[in-house]
Amino acid sequence: MSRVTLSRYLIEQTRSHNTPADLRFLIEVVARACKAISHQVSKGALGGVLGSLDSENVQGEVQKKLDVISNEILLEANEWGGHLAGMASEEMDNAYQIPGKYPKGAYLLVFDPLDGSSNIDVNVSVGTIFSVLRCPDRNGDTGDLGEDAFLQPGTQQVAAGYAIYGPQTMLMLTLGDGVKGFTLDRELGSFVLTHDNIKVPESTKEFAINMSNQRHWEAPVQRYVSELLAGETGPLGRNYNMRWIASMVADVHRILTRGGVFMYPRDAREPDKPGKLRLMYEANPMSMIIEQAGGAATDGSQRILDIQPTSLHQRVPVFLGSKEEVLRVTAYHRG
């Protein structure tokens, strides 16, 4: 039986599900950019790409060399193809305007070019997260694209995915009809379908959270985690294992493939900030993927995909993964 490449899968989606050709081409370009990023990541110290720069991004976070390299790869790969009206990135304060010499398309691309980059110097898996939205009708306006065009709830995503750069490079993708996993065949130079119709187990015995922040959590999270730690003699009646990689892509990938709950709650240290993770290019695409795999994703009080964004770099608390556990911790928040 012949192997199904990403290109073949997307062509078949165009035939059977009327996936627009422009969306197919866009996903293929993003995938090629992810291959280029994977190549840069794999060089490590040999390529002189490790370490930090003297600059900070809009979040006030020190930029790694590979943050900037990955961001440039995605911008340069996607700006000229005619599929996009604009882009936005964790590494840029404002929306990226498609240069006037290139045609503009119907979609918006939002991304975290290198999630988990704080771990890159110690050779931990990192990744790229992306979300695709339709650009609202601009009624003939040819001026710069404003931030408002991007401020759409996650339910409006037409595609979402992430690439994980680990022992293998994988691309996890949803077009709104389930989740597929593709592994990069370096000999072919193509992503090949290796994981079909991925489903998150409804219940689990694993959880991912940064326990060092426990003293700062709100009461519902304190309660839930204490019940997890109580094991089979506690109210949940079973033992749980904790896993924490400190790379959202790596933690969510493990949960997507074998079950679990990922938590990044708000805490008391920065009460004016509702969370650490960004809604538009971290929480929304990951939530779409998890929901399409049968899981759930909330901010503790509501479904993440229903949140109406108010700013491009808006932060939210995140609870996602196996449905049973996400609904339990959400119920604790609701009282």
From Swiss-Prot:
Organismal lineage: Bacteria, Pseudomonadati, Pseudomonadota, Gammaproteobacteria, Pseudomonadales
Listed name of the protein: Fructose-1,6-bisphosphatase class 1
Gene Ontology molecular-function annotations: fructose 1,6-bisphosphate 1-phosphatase activity; magnesium ion binding
InterPro entries: FBPase_C_dom, FBPase_class-1, FBPase_N, FBPtase
Gene that encodes it: fbp
CDD domains: FBPase (cd00354)
Main location: cytoplasm
Pathway named in the protein's UniProt entry: Carbohydrate biosynthesis; gluconeogenesis
Catalysis performed (reactions): beta-D-fructose 1,6-bisphosphate + H2O = beta-D-fructose 6-phosphate + phosphate
Names of the cofactor(s): Mg(2+)
HAMAP family the UniProt entry points to: FBPase_class1
Coiled coil (residue ranges): none
Residues at which substrate binds: D115, G116, S117, S118, N210, K276
Gene Ontology process terms (BP): fructose 1,6-bisphosphate metabolic process; fructose 6-phosphate metabolic process; fructose metabolic process; gluconeogenesis; sucrose biosynthetic process
GO cellular component: cytosol
Family of this protein: Belongs to the FBPase class 1 family.
Gene3D superfamilies the UniProt entry points to: 3.40.190.80, Fructose-1,6-Bisphosphatase, subunit A, domain 1 (3.30.540.10)
EC assignment: 3.1.3.11
Superkingdom field: Bacteria
